């Protein structure tokens, strides 16, 4: 038995008048109910404790015959229970077209709202029952009325449920294509944490619901009716950003083809290009990567965006929410203010994205607010195990790093450039992770084997775990004696650290 719209008070021991008929239908004693109706021995409108009438219970049970008998006996098709539910809203919830038609023919109000302002049309809109929606609309259901809690219309409900055909029916009956839901104006709380404060949620459009769900048919239906493809929510998230963020790359491609702004960023400064690069190598919270089912891949979106004029040098405006953890605690300090798509790609040793970005004018060593550059990041510098989730131990990581470094160096990246708060060089990062192949590759290209960071540490110190900690499961994983011996054999020496008044703040590691 469905109970979404019927109050849980039905089991209460109190009764409002003679509710024998309602009790019989609710408890499944159908024969007894039919007998009471036939003999007129019970009031067909007598409700039980929560105001639920026999007709509402019959609609809830999908009992077409009982619904017809009750109406012929004088049941009120518009009588509500304490939650504002009517027989019509219950039939809509059950997606029962026949009962919807019977009730409407008997005078049921197609616009009767529940306690939260939700109408039968909104309820039907979440289903695939276009026929029931058409019955309601033909009887005068208001297609643009909003429910009270979130200010959402039937079109938004349909979009959030990926009901393309339903949306087309609603749009054909005049649904406002760009209507916005309410904005949740919560009282802001002062936070001492160094992280961005989100904008008030809400102001969602049917387009934003559709792109969030990845419903191509829904998006196409809206575009055909003239929906604005760049209308954002209060956080600046546009339909294109929403589609990419939620891994709906076919939808993203369609929006780009329809003229979506490829350079519009959100509250945090994330452009569509940044998010596409981000998703191309995004680990999902320690679990295996979950590839999209779309034909279009993230790297395809990167290419399409660049071909459409996306600016590869747009920088983040603030530290964005961290996608791979349950809460934004600003874990990854490298991908912060000033980070470019190229730096994001370099951090992941994503040679394919790096090549595309460089070919389209990315500035090779544009630093972020921490002074970190793509060339230094590509060698593993600036990251710790906490924000790579084991990614830096993949079997092909060193080959990826070498390919990425070669691209960056060929476009002007500095082999001995020092970056970040600790002024680290590419060789420091490779030594820190114990990447022997990368160390040898950098040295063969002429990397300064004894270059020191701002504290006086050399690559030998990084390899031996003296220049910063890294641990997993409480065990240190930052001592790579083989790497240290390799560097020493080639002339490397340990540095003489300068006196530090305090260790620089931020994650441990390079």
Indicate where each model-derived feature is located.
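Ankyrin repeat structural motif
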Residues: 30-37, 63-71, 96-104, 129-137, ...
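Ankyrin repeat A-helix N-terminal signature
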Residues: 23-27, 57-63, 90-96, 123-129, ...
């Amino acid at each position: 038995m469905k109970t979404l719209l019927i109050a849980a008070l039905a089991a209460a021991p109190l009764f409002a008048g003679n509710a024998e008929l309602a009790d019989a239908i609710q408890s499944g004693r159908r024969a007894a109910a039919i007998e009471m109706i036939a003999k007129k021995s019970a009031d067909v409108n007598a409700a039980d404790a929560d105001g639920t009438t026999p007709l509402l219970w019959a609609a809830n049970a999908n009992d077409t015959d009982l619904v017809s008998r009750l109406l012929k006996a004088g049941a009120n098709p518009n009588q509500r229970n304490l939650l504002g539910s009517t027989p019509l809203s219950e039939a809509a919830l059950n997606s029962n077209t026949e009962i919807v038609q019977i009730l409407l023919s008997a005078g049921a109000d197609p616009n009767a709202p529940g306690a939260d302002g939700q109408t039968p049309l909104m309820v039907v809109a979440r289903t695939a029952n276009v026929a029931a929606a058409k019955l309601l609309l033909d009887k005068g259901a208001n297609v643009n009325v909003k429910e009270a809690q979130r200010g959402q219309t039937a079109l938004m409900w349909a979009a959030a449920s990926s009901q393309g055909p339903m949306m087309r029916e609603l749009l054909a009956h005049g649904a406002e294509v760009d209507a916005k839901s309410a904005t949740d104006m919560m009282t802001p709380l002062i936070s001492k944490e160094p992280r961005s404060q989100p904008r008030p949620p809400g102001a969602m459009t049917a387009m934003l619901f559709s792109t969030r769900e990845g419903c191509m048919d829904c998006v196409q239906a809206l575009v055909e009716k003239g929906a604005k493809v760049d209308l954002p929510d209060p956080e600046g998230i546009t339909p294109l950003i929403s589609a990419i963020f939620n891994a709906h790359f076919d939808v993203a491609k369609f929006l780009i083809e329809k003229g979506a702004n490829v350079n519009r960023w959100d509250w945090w400064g994330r452009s569509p290009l940044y998010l596409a690069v981000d998703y191309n190598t995004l680990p999902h919270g320690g679990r295996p990567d979950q590839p999209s089912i779309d034909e279009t891949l993230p790297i395809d979106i990167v290419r399409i965006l660049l071909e459409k004029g996306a600016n590869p040098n747009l920088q983040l405006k603030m530290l964005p929410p961290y996608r791979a953890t349950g809460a934004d605690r600003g874990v990854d300090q490298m991908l912060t203010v000033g980070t470019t798509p190229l730096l994001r790609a370099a951090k992941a040793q994503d040679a394919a994205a790096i090549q595309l970005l460089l070919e389209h004018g990315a500035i090779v060593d544009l630093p972020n607010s921490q002074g970190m550059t793509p060339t230094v990041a590509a060698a593993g510098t600036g990251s710790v195990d906490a924000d790579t989730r084991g990614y830096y131990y993949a079997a092909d990581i060193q080959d990826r790093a070498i390919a990425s470094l070669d691209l960056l160096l060929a476009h002007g990246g500095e082999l001995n450039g020092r970056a970040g708060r600790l002024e680290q060089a590419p060789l420091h990062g490779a030594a820190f992770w114990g990447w022997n192949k990368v160390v040898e590759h950098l040295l063969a290209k002429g990397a300064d084997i004894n270059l020191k960071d701002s504290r006086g540490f050399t690559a030998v110190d990084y390899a031996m775990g003296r220049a910063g900690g890294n641990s997993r499961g409480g065990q240190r994983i930052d001592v790579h004696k083989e790497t240290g011996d390799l560097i020493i054999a080639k002339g490397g020496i340990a540095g003489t650290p300068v006196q530090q008044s305090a260790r620089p703040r931020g994650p441990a590691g390079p």
